[in-house]
């Protein structure tokens, strides 16, 4: 077969390869920052596609969607336009773990995002298969497509997802493919290896889809959406609220299901040695669950509609790569699915990922300058994690094209910052999923305050309009004004005690500040406000902030003190060309890890596995005593 002739096809400031959730956010960020941007995708039909669960949000992940929105991204707005169910999770728990989750109409989500991208100034959308990164003098200068088209750029962002040398596995059947039977990206992986990148294989999977018309919902438990307005985007008004929401449904596996799986483990690629890639710890296949948790009599499953105009239902928590005939037997053993028609078989997919320790905190690679990577190819799982990386890579690619300095988020700024720091500092041996437990400062990184944390940064970057920023400033001022009022207004026992005694609470002996009264667990803002004169009319989001900031003031202060200590360590930069071999006293493992990771700050060095406090102290002393000139030679 003759070589495809190459030709010059255009010049851009930023090129983004891949139009999944990472690629869409990266391209939109770069274009909105005024950079001429190309978004290249294997298939226009796969743009912002949801090949697995048709939902967004949940613990930690839902907060990431809010953070993307606060920075000026699109994911939150797009799901608000296209959801079919919205629920706030963990409402009985504290604000640090509350999280919004939306069921998406996956076809509408794709169409809506495609419409936004097609109508964004500075942004060209094109179908094509990238095969090579053009590199000159160690810098990315463009990409080559399979057709021979060469696109030049000042910076390049790769978001290839699970297409990178993708291989789908269903029982004994294996074939080269991207997700949902899209084209795989094979040559790009080979090119990255030639450039010196270290790749590894990961695996993920998806459950079967069944025809909702053949489900007996009477045998399942209904999970309706919330009856009060909730939104991912801070710009979506409460008046835009879907009242006609679609329910999800819950059912369970049983002893028969488990026996079918056990009887056919010899045909399960997970256990026959066919699958080599490492799968996600927090989203195991159903056959893996049955083996690992053999004592469990049942596992819950969620039946989730894939959209308003389709009968397809996603069988959540039933991911499998079993042969199709076994999948049918498994499904038909489940209550409500006895006669379910299989519309799509579940499958596993293996794919290439870049070892993320080869990345900087900006998501620029250490191997090739001006080349950024984001999304699942960095070793993460999940649409939200991908989109969070995408907006950061797009911002930094645009800043690099403009000749400006980098933009990063610290662990105390955002869950996005936690994720990126985990990836570039620790790497990952399995598909990485964000969890609230990964964040040290989760009381500061809440669902409700993402705009207070990040919107000023988004405005400074040019991603938040002056109009939206003015609305934000008004909200922030209203919060500060009300906090000041409650911190300076006293309540008298004679006004409050009748209510307290009527509700069987201990009465007050002395006057108390309104803010201290609000700290009592039995008191909420509305209860307290009835004892105050001249209450202002406040938006419920302002009231929510006031109540959280007062009730959790002590805990918030403790976390802020920890953040201040961390910032001092983050301020201690490690020179780029430091020679760790010249530093006496470092443990061998610590020296090897420091050479491999190349941390940018003392704080980052302290988080590397294998680098102990003594090593950090030695490194700090060398830098502080000015011996860096010696060790950098």
From Swiss-Prot:
GO MF terms, alphabetically ordered: flavin adenine dinucleotide binding
Main location: cytoplasm
Transmembrane segments: none
Listed Basic and acidic residues bias regions: 216-229
Binding site for FAD: 18-23
Spans annotated as Disordered: 208-232
Cofactor: FAD
Database matches in SMART domains: GIDA_assoc_3
GO biological process: tRNA methylation; tRNA wobble uridine modification
Keyword annotations: Cytoplasm, FAD, Flavoprotein, NAD, tRNA processing
Compartment list: Cytoplasm
Pfam families: GIDA, GIDA_C_1st, SAM_GIDA_C
Binding of NAD(+), residues: 279-293
PROSITE patterns referenced in this protein's UniProt entry, alphabetically: GIDA_1, GIDA_2
Flavoprotein among keywords: yes
CC terms in the record's Gene Ontology section: cytosol
Family to which this protein belongs: Belongs to the MnmG family.
PANTHER family cross-referenced by the UniProt entry: GLUCOSE INHIBITED DIVISION PROTEIN A, PROTEIN MTO1 HOMOLOG, MITOCHONDRIAL
Subunit structure, interactors included: Homodimer. Heterotetramer of two MnmE and two MnmG subunits.
Protein task: NAD-binding protein involved in the addition of a carboxymethylaminomethyl (cmnm) group at the wobble position (U34) of certain tRNAs, forming tRNA-cmnm(5)s(2)U34.
Name of the protein in question: tRNA uridine 5-carboxymethylaminomethyl modification enzyme MnmG
Organism for this UniProt entry: Lacticaseibacillus paracasei (strain ATCC 334 / BCRC 17002 / CCUG 31169 / CIP 107868 / KCTC 3260 / NRRL B-441)
Gene name per UniProt: mnmG
């Amino acid at each position: 077969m003759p070589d495809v002739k190459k030709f010059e096809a255009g010049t851009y400031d930023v090129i983004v390869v891949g139009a999944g959730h990472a690629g869409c956010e990266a391209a939109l960020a770069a274009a909105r920052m005024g950079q001429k941007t190309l978004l290249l995708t294997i298939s226009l039909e796969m743009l912002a596609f949801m090949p697995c669960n048709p939902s967004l949000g949940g613990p930690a992940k839902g907060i990431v969607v809010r953070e993307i929105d606060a920075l000026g991204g699109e994911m939150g707005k797009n799901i608000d336009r296209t959801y079919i169910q919205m629920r706030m999770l963990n409402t009985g728990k504290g604000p640090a773990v509350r999280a919004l989750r939306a069921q998406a109409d996956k076809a509408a989500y794709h169409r809506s995002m495609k419409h936004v991208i097609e109508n964004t100034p500075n942004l060209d959308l094109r179908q094509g298969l990238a095969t090579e990164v053009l590199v000159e003098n160690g810098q990315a200068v463009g990409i080559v497509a399979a057709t021979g088209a060469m696109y030049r750029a000042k910076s390049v962002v790769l978001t290839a997802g699970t297409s990178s040398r993708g291989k789908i596995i269903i029982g004994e059947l294996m074939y080269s493919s991207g997700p949902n039977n899209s084209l795989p990206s094979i040559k790009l992986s080979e090119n990255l290896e030639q450039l010196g990148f270290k790749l590894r294989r990961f695996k993920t999977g998806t459950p079967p889809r069944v025809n909702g018309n053949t489900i007996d919902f009477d045998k399942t438990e209904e999970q309706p959406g919330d009856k009060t307005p909730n939104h991912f985007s801070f710009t979506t008004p409460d008046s835009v609220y879907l009242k006609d929401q679609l329910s999800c449904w819950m059912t369970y596996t049983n002893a028969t299901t488990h026996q079918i799986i056990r009887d056919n483990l010899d045909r399960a690629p997970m256990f026959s040695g066919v699958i080599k890639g490492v799968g996600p710890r927090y989203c195991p296949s159903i056959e893996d669950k049955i083996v690992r948790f053999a004592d469990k009599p049942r596992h819950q499953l969620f039946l989730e509609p894939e959209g308003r105009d389709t009968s397809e239902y996603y069988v959540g928590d039933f991911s499998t790569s079993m042969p199709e005939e076994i999948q049918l037997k498994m499904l038909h053993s489940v209550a409500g699915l006895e006669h379910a028609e299989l519309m799509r078989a579940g499958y596993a997919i293996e794919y290439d990922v870049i070892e993320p320790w080869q990345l900087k905190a900006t998501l620029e690679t250490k191997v090739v300058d001006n080349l950024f990577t984001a999304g699942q190819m960095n070793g993460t799982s999940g649409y939200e994690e991908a989109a969070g990386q995408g907006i950061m890579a797009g911002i930094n690619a645009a800043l690099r094209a403009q000749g400006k300095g980098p933009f990063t988020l610290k662990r105390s700024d955002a869950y996005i910052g936690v994720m990126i720091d985990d990836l570039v500092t620790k790497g990952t041996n399995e598909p990485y999923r964000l969890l609230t437990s990964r964040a040290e400062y989760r009381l500061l990184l809440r669902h409700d305050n993402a705009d207070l944390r990040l919107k000023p940064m988004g405005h400074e970057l040019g991603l938040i309009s002056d109009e939206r920023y003015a609305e934000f400033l008004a909200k922030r001022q209203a919060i500060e004004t009300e906090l000041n009022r409650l911190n300076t207004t006293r309540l008298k026992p004679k006004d409050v005690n009748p209510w307290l005694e009527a509700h069987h609470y201990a009465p007050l002996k002395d006057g108390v500040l309104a803010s201290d009264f609000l700290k009592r667990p039995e008191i909420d803002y509305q209860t307290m406000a009835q004892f105050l004169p001249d209450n202002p009319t406040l938006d419920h989001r302002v009231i929510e902030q006031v109540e959280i900031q007062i009730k959790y003031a002590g805990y918030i202060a403790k976390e802020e003190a920890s953040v201040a200590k961390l910032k001092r360590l983050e301020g201690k930069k490690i020179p780029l060309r430091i020679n760790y071999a010249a530093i006496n006293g470092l443990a061998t493992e610590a020296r090897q890890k420091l050479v491999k990771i190349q941390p940018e700050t003392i704080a980052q060095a302290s988080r590397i596995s294998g680098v102990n406090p003594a090593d950090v102290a030695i490194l700090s002393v060398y830098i502080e005593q000015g011996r860096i000139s010696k060790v950098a030679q």
